[in-house]
């Protein structure tokens, strides 16, 4: 079907939860997408930070092709081939142990089971992290919240409140929506679950006051090192360090939502690592499996073991297909130095954006970038639509804010094409 036919059926049969742009993508390769007419687009959104290797990457395609011929799903009642190995990769990445992660990744790629078994073993004194595999970022955050509260009840301070930051985004379920401190998103679905406290991002005084007032009632603090949906707003190093210190002094846990900023998008395996902080729990999704639905809650083992069988679960999470995708993506990211490339490419993108006369601020790290337009420049949503006509895919998070989340294979040539087109459209609007 062509775009018009698909739009007609979409309007009849699909719930109206998204306002869609008028394009029907049919296939992609690398940084490029193609629509039903054959038109080519440069993708600077990557399915909202999901397709970290771009489109049609051979490592992912081969892994999925092989797995679909073998086994798709059997449920969590049984052991899943390579699931523990993927969890071991995540454990080593959580320790920022790139040498250990690469040794395991190369063993997995070689197909040498004994070498992989040996590489997966934790070294003496190594912090072990355990993983619960889910299907999405919201599910990963649900698991993180449940684990933090359960840990507080059984081993911590007995609290159940979770501190969240204004402008954050943690999902669309009722619980994660309650943690998403954006009134416009929460209002239609009141009453939401309770037990959440709000603080302004980077407000150290406000955070200290919150802990002084509520102290032992707090089970955890949930942060995004870089708030994505509100326009790519990084937390300061000082604020995150204070959050960690206050949480641990109160017997609470620090939870890092790495759904958008993690998986080497900002350089380090997880964005919080660039701030010199190790959290207690992390929520992952988006880029972890390159486009196959997959999420993960990763926690220090001594915290993760709070769960007992039957206290949390999933039907589809950690399926054979999702694990195969995650293994292929993680091995490629680890062995291919994608984090270093993301930093270099992101720095160049920010420099080019910052040089545009209508841009008032550029924010971000690596290939997670946002920029604000002058209020009298043009509407960001109109600009996104115009650039789509020009063959570029990006995103607006507000009337004057653009967001860039390209695949981690993005080159300086790709960036030049985009920014030149953006400059032309801004000049026309002015």
What do the PLM-derived regions correspond to, one by one?
Residues 1-430:
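Conserved N-terminal phosphate-binding loop of PLP-dependent enzymes in the Aspartate aminotransferase
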């Amino acid at each position: 079907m062509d775009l018009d036919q698909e739009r007609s059926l979409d309007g009849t049969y699909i719930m109206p939860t998204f306002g869609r742009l008028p394009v029907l993508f049919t296939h992609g390769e690398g940084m490029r997408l193609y629509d039903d007419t054959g038109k080519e687009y440069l993708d600077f959104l990557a399915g909202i930070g999901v397709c970290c290797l771009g489109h049609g990457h051979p490592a992912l395609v081969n892994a999925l092709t092989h797995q679909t011929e073998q086994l798709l799903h059997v449920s969590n009642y049984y052991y899943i081939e390579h699931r523990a190995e993927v969890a071991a990769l995540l454990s080593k990445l959580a320790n920022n142990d790139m040498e250990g992660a690469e040794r395991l990744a190369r063993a997995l790629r070689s197909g040498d089971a004994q070498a992989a078994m040996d590489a997966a073993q934790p070294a003496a004194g190594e912090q072990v992290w355990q993983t619960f595999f889910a299907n999405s970022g919201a599910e990963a955050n649900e698991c993180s919240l449940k684990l933090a509260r359960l840990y507080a009840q059984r081993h911590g301070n007995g609290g159940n409140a979770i501190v969240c930051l204004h402008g954050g985004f943690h999902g669309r379920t009722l619980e994660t929506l309650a943690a998403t401190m954006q009134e416009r998103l929460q209002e239609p679905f009141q009453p939401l679950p309770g037990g959440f406290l709000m603080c302004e991002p980077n407000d150290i005084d406000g955070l200290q006051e919150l802990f002084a007032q509520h102290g032992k009632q707090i089970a955890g603090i949930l942060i995004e090192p870089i708030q994505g949906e509100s326009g790519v707003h990084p937390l300061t190093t000082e604020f995150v360090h204070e959050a960690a210190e206050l949480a641990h002094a109160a017997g609470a846990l620090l939870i890092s939502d790495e759904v958008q900023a993690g998986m080497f998008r900002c350089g380090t395996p997880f964005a919080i690592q660039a701030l010199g902080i190790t959290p207690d729990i992390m929520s992952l999704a988006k880029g972890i499996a390159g486009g196959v639905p997959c999420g993960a809650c990763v926690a220090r083992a001594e915290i993760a073991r709070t769960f007992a069988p039957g206290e949390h679960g999933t039907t589809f999470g950690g399926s054979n297909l999702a694990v195969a995708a995650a293994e292929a993506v993680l091995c490629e990211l680890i062995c291919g130095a994608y984090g270093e490339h993301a930093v270099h490419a992101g720095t160049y993108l920010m420099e080019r954006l910052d040089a545009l006369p209508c841009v008032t601020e550029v924010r971000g790290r690596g290939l997670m970038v946002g920029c604000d337009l002058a209020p009298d420049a043009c509407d960001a949503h109109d600009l996104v639509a115009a650039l789509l006509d020009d063959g570029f895919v990006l995103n607006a998070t507000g009337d004057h804010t653009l967001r860039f989340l390209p695949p981690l294979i993005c080159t300086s040539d790709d960036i030049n094409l985009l920014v030149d087109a953006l400059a032309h459209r801004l000049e026309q609007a002015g």
